[in-house]
């Protein structure tokens, strides 16, 4: 089963223009769903992504990518 990433295109702390290429590099076969994820509170302060239906957040994008690597299905 492939990995799934869900990101918000409206949250202030998430820059989808830089995040999407990094996610594609982690798993080129993953599904990427871009829309409101109803995670607005944390999304104002931290960069976040849902990875396989689990929220992953970090103060910046580089830290987020490191956390996402640990959540990926092999």
Swiss-Prot record:
Pfam family membership, one: DUF1450
Record field: transmembrane: none
Family matches, as InterPro entries: DUF1450, UPF0741
Top-rank lineage group of the source organism: Bacteria
Family: Belongs to the UPF0741 family.
Stated name of the protein: UPF0741 protein BH3821
Source organism per UniProt: Halalkalibacterium halodurans (strain ATCC BAA-125 / DSM 18197 / FERM 7344 / JCM 9153 / C-125)
């Amino acid at each position: 089963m492939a990995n799934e990433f869900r990101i918000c295109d409206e949250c202030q702390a998430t820059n989808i223009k830089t995040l999407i290429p990094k996610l594609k590099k982690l798993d080129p076969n993953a599904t990427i769903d871009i829309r409101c994820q109803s995670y607005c509170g944390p999304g104002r302060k931290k960069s976040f992504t849902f990875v396989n239906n689990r929220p992953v957040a970090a103060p910046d994008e580089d830290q987020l990518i490191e956390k996402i690597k640990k959540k990926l299905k092999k």
